[in-house]
């Protein structure tokens, strides 16, 4: 089980990403627009740098919803592989069966 502080930190990052998503998209569009003047693009770049680092979606880490484990997490379920295995063997995930061929 991951420390509670790490799990809470990820939740805080997710909130920041959601809060600044539109502003980041607008600034990045201005920066990428070749028709804008050089001064506008430069000022947009400076403004983007002023945003919090944790507002960048690349700083987010997928974690298991139950244990907080950062590795081996399946996006579809939001769970770590160990927990998927436990829950699947109990039959609590509909439509998920053990493979056999």
UniProtKB/Swiss-Prot annotation:
Gene Ontology terms describing biological process: translation
Domain of life: Bacteria
Entries under InterPro entries matching the protein: Ribosomal_uS14, Ribosomal_uS14_bac/plastid
Record GO terms (molecular function): rRNA binding; structural constituent of ribosome
Keywords: Ribonucleoprotein, Ribosomal protein, RNA-binding, rRNA-binding
GO CC terms in record: cytoplasm; small ribosomal subunit
Tagged with keyword Lipid biosynthesis: no
Keyword Ribonucleoprotein: yes
A Pfam family annotated for this UniProt entry: Ribosomal_S14
UniProt similarity note: Belongs to the universal ribosomal protein uS14 family.
Quaternary structure and partners: Part of the 30S ribosomal subunit. Contacts proteins S3 and S10.
PANTHER family: 30S RIBOSOMAL PROTEIN S14, SMALL RIBOSOMAL SUBUNIT PROTEIN US14M
Function: Binds 16S rRNA, required for the assembly of 30S particles and may also be responsible for determining the conformation of the 16S rRNA at the A site.
Stored HAMAP family: Ribosomal_uS14_1
Protein name: Small ribosomal subunit protein uS14
Species per Swiss-Prot/TrEMBL record: Cupriavidus necator (strain ATCC 17699 / DSM 428 / KCTC 22496 / NCIMB 10442 / H16 / Stanier 337) (Ralstonia eutropha)
């Amino acid at each position: 089980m991951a420390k509670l502080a790490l799990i809470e930190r990820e939740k805080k990052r997710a909130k920041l990403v959601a809060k600044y998503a539109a502003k980041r998209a607008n600034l990045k569009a201005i920066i990428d627009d070749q028709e804008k003047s050089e001064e506008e693009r430069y000022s947009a770049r400076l403004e983007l740098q002023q945003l919090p680092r944790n507002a960048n979606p690349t700083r987010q880490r997928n974690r298991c919803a139950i244990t907080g484990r950062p590795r081996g997490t399946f996006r579809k379920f939001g769970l770590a592989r160990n927990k998927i295995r436990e829950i699947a063997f109990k039959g609590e995930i509909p439509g998920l069966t053990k493979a056999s061929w």
